[in-house]
Amino acid sequence: NHFGNSTYIFTPLYIANYCENYCVYCGFNCYNDIHRKQLSMEEIEHEMKVIADSGIEEILMLTGESKSKSSITYIGDACRLAKKYFRNVGLEIYPCNTKDYAYLHECGADYVTVFQETYNADKYETLHLMGHKRVFPYRFEAQERALMGGMRGVGFSALLGLSDFRKDALATALHVYYLQRKYPHAEMSLSC
């Protein structure tokens, strides 16, 4: 209904890169001494206008996983701006509860992508040493909460190579299959 036999090009836009997690493999983790930035609404709108002027009709807004630096209100305000410029607005942010996903959808978000990182719960625990991301089940259930909050679509992925890539690829497919059966109206996508 929304996409048909079409292909859309999207571009990512990091609106903030603060993180409160300690993931041993990630360059953005809270212990890495890198330049951190949270764009103002004026900066976000400027970037969106430049991107939209290039002809791109879909944007994926990303934040680091910091609820204190990238509040739901901040992300919602960015979604409202994005809807002025883009047909489709996606988010790749920290996992949220259903109420927050519903709010973001009301603000203009169409879909959410969540990287599970690995579906191997034991390996997951050894890679995520601190922060909200450490809670495996909460991350695993994020896509379903997004759909319950009204999102039109959800994206899935594992970071292949953190654990056995074959098992993670299969687990990702099974995760999609399960939610596709439960929410047949929803759009599902996979990232590599």
Model-derived segments and spans:
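Short amphipathic alpha-helices and their capping/turn segments at secondary-structure boundaries
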Residues: 48-49, 97-108, 170-184
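Conserved C-terminal portion of the radical SAM core fold
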Residues: 58, 63, 137-192
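Glycine-rich anion/phosphate-binding loops
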Residues: 33-46, 135-138, 171
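Glycine-rich, proline-tolerant flexible connector loops at the mouths of alpha/beta enzymes
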Residues: 10-13, 60-72
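Radical SAM/AdoMet-radical enzyme domain recognition
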Residues: 23, 57-59, 72-159
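An N-cap/entry alpha-helix motif that binds or orients negatively charged groups
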Residues: 1-8
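Short Fe-S-cluster ligation motifs
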Residues: 46-66
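Canonical Radical SAM [4Fe-4S] cluster-binding loop centered on the CxxxCxxC motif
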Residues: 8-43
